Design a protein with these regions (language model features):
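Short, surface-exposed glycine/acidic/tryptophan-bearing loops
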Residues: 54-100, 116
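Hydrophobic side chains within well-formed alpha-helices
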Residues: 26, 30, 48, 52, ...
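Bacterial N-terminal signal peptides
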Residues: 8-16
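Sec/Tat signal peptide C-region and signal peptidase I cleavage site
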Residues: 17-22
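Surface-exposed patches in mature extracellular/periplasmic domains of secreted proteins
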Residues: 40-54, 67-79, 113-129
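Disulfide-stabilized extracellular recognition modules
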Residues: 94-146
Length: 146
């Protein structure tokens, strides 16, 4: 019985943290892709901000349930961040498994592309959530702040 519990605990640790590991890796991939797009038009690169990363991951889990810029409690999407009058933006996407496909999807949308290329933005957070039993499975959030 003890061996069984150890195996179960190991499986939980391995698979329970895989979504967080994926989110962290995807954030770096998205940052690199976004900064390449910004460089093409002469806009300064963004940097990842830890607080925006945390907020974007909260939003990614929220949009699994309700794919909207409105939070589950009915409040504005920006209430998840401490922006207090700063310039900010949010991009959401669903359905693509890779950072490349997701950034490409955003770049093919006028509104999302404007956020990515906005010169006033200096920081970004990227959130990712995977839910096997949901409509789109892969959920992405970008939060921007300037």
């Amino acid at each position: 019985m003890k061996k069984f519990l150890i195996i179960c605990a190991a499986i939980f640790v391995l698979f329970g943290t895989s979504n967080a590991y994926a989110a962290e890796n995807f954030a770096v991939e998205v940052l690199n892709l976004v900064n390449a797009e910004r460089a093409k038009v002469g806009v300064a690169p963004l940097r990842l901000a830890d607080d925006l990363q945390a907020a974007a991951n909260i939003r990614a889990r929220e949009i699994v349930q309700n794919f909207s810029h409105t939070r589950p409690d009915g409040s504005d999407c920006f209430t998840v961040m401490q922006y207090r009058g700063r310039t900010c933006g949010e991009n959401i996407a669903a359905g693509h498994a890779s950072a490349y496909e997701t950034v490409e999807q955003w770049m093919n949308s006028d509104y999302h592309r404007e956020n990515i290329l906005e010169p006033a933005f200096t920081e970004m957070g990227v959130g990712y959530a995977y839910e096997d039993y949901s409509t789109y499975h892969h959920y992405w959030v970008q939060l921007f702040r300037g």
